[in-house]
């Protein structure tokens, strides 16, 4: 979620009215899945932070599938938001707002 690369909520929704919520347990599946989704016309990809491999999967997609716009889901803390940004996330989805998560988001928008 760098200043040049982050997206507003409106930009995300305008570009992709449907965003798959992806749970990945194996980083080897991340790039092939992302490529298949992009080939099918879906480029906004939300990788949830529900597995130990989620950040590595986000990083792999961000590096290997430049047509994809990878985001982080299940962002529950400022640490989650920061880690997702460092892994290449361009947007984040949180189950609830906290000021700490909001501050990280604003710092990267």
Put a short name on every predicted segment.
Residues 107-109:
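Conserved small/polar residues in nucleotide/adenosyl-binding loops
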Residues 88-102:
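Glycine-rich phosphate-binding active-site loops on the catalytic face of alpha/beta enzymes
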Residues 1-88:
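Conserved N-terminal beta1-alpha1 strand-loop-helix module at the mouth
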């Amino acid at each position: 979620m760098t200043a040049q690369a982050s997206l507003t909520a409106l930009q995300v929704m305008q570009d992709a009215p449907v965003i798959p919520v992806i749970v990945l347990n194996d980083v080897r599946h991340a790039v092939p899945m992302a490529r298949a989704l992009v080939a099918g016309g879906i480029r906004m990809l939300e990788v949830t932070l529900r597995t130990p491999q989620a950040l590595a999967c986000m990083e792999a997609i961000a590096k290997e599938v430049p047509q994809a716009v990878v985001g982080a889901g299940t962002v529950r803390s400022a640490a989650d938001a920061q880690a997702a940004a460092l892994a290449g996330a361009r947007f984040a989805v949180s189950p609830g707002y906290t000021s700490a998560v909001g501050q990280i988001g604003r710092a990267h928008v």
